[in-house]
C-alpha cells in the first residue's frame, strides 16, 4: 500500500490515520462485493483501531506482538535503523508511540512462537469463528 495507494503519506499521526482510512475504504469496497479481506498494517493508535472496528463488519483485530528489540532485529528494510539515527521522524516505537491493543481478538507472540505456530493459531481462530472453512487433514 505504501508504494501505491498511500505513497504520498508519511508517518505522522494524521498520515497514519489517512493510511488506515484509505485501506479501510478499499477493504469495505471489496467486502461489499463479496471479496474477503485480510489487511495487515501497523496501526499504532487505539483510537484508529476502535474507529475501524466501529465502521466495518466482521472485523477481527490480530495483534502480532514482539518486543521492540526483536522487531528491530527483524527489520529487513532498515527502517528502524534510519529512525534510530533520526532520519525518519514520527516512527512507531522510536519517536512516536505504539499503543498496544487493549483487547485484541487474536494475540500471537512471535518472539515465543515460530511463524508456523503463529499462522496455525490465527488460522485455527478464524476456523473456530466460522470465518474460514475448517481445513481437511492432509
Feature locations, PLM:
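Small-molecule kinase domains that catalyze NTP-dependent phosphoryl transfer to phosphate-bearing small molecules
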Residues: 65-68, 72-120, 129-138
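Conserved alpha-helical scaffold flanking the Walker A/P-loop in AAA+ ATPase domains
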Residues: 19-29, 95
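ATP-dependent NMP and nucleoside kinases share a basic, alpha-helical "lid"
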Residues: 2-15, 27-84, 90
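Conserved amphipathic alpha-helical interaction elements at protein-protein interfaces in regulatory
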Residues: 29-32, 128, 132
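Hydrophobic "lid"/C-terminal helical patch
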Residues: 27, 122, 126
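Flexible, glycine- and charge-enriched loops at secondary-structure boundaries
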Residues: 12-20, 112
Amino acid at each position: 500500500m505504501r508504494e501505491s495507494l498511500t505513497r504520498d503519506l508519511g508517518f505522522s499521526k494524521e498520515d497514519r490515520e489517512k493510511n488506515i482510512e484509505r485501506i479501510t475504504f478499499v477493504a469495505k469496497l471489496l467486502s461489499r462485493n463479496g471479496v474477503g479481506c485480510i489487511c495487515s498494517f501497523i496501526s499504532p493508535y487505539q483510537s484508529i483501531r476502535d474507529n475501524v472496528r466501529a465502521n466495518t463488519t466482521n472485523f477481527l483485530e490480530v495483534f502480532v506482538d514482539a518486543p521492540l528489540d526483536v522487531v528491530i532485529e527483524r527489520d529487513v528494510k532498515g527502517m528502524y535503523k534510519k529512525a534510530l539515527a533520526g532520519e525518519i521522524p514520527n516512527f512507531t516505537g522510536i519517536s512516536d508511540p505504539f499503543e498496544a491493543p487493549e483487547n485484541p481478538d487474536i494475540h500471537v507472540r512471535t518472539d515465543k512462537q515460530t511463524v508456523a505456530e503463529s499462522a496455525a493459531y490465527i488460522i485455527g481462530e478464524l476456523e473456530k469463528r466460522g470465518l474460514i472453512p475448517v481445513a481437511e487433514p492432509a
